[in-house]
Amino acid sequence: MERTIAVVTGASSGLGKEFAKLLVRRKEIDEVWAIARRKDKLTELKKELGEKIIPFSVDLSDAGQIISWQQALEKQKPDIRYLINDAGFAKFCSYLDLSIEDSLNMIHVNCDAVVAMTLSCLPYMNAKSKILNISSQASFQPLPYLNLYSATKAFIRHYSRALNVELEERGIQVTAVCPGWMMTHLYGRATVGAKKGTHKFYGMKKPGPVARKALKDADLYKDMSVYSLYVKGSHLGAKLLPHRLVMKLWLYQQKL
């Protein structure tokens, strides 16, 4: 009998790990293919969550490694029920502190890799399969000193919602998950070396509840998942107010 698979990128920590925890508990999922760069973290994850975890060490900023992943899929031809594109890269700073290398890595991991993972997994997905792409509250409007990160997350939100319409005929659901600030290592790493940048993270939440709501919303065939009243208020404000004003309010909040 064909194994049913959930694929989770960025699975070794943070929100990705919370998704992995939830998916291993689902009886309909035989294996969770956990993708991350660090083999040691993946080994720890397997010890913690059990035999359902199948680790794959893949650097999603490397196109060659993504192609190797695609070739592994072609050999195994799994029945993919869930694809969670959680892997992300962030630098919260002025353009002056953002190198060309970091800029391109952010685009590769946050945008290119999501598209590549989605296209590589779609041939092995069927009706009722789910794709959850992690966008952000930052996607709702342009954000100075978060300019590239917010732009990559806006790409993910629009890509996911448009793709969801295209995949309706196949019965595959795509959900853009738009969390606010979360208690993960991403934010500590993102501010390292920034002389001037984002440093006030209001409405910080634990990633577990965000993951639970995201899966629930995907199962309810919602094309967006927004957790917490704070983030919902931010979304409404970004729709009602001119973005020039929203950016000024953002700068005032961050004291920039």
Give the residues covered by each predicted segment:
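Conserved glycine-rich cofactor-binding loop
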Residues: S12-S13
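Active-site helix of classical SDR
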Residues: T118, T152
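Conserved NAD(P)H cofactor-binding loop of Rossmann-fold oxidoreductase domains
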Residues: D86-K91
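Residue(s) in the substrate-gating loop at a strand-loop-helix junction
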Residues: S136
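Substrate-binding pocket helix/loop in short-chain dehydrogenase/reductase
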Residues: S94-Y95, D102-I107
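SDR active-site lid
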Residues: E169-L229
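Conserved glycine-rich Rossmann-like NAD(P)H-binding loop of the short-chain dehydrogenase/reductase
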Residues: V24, E28-E44
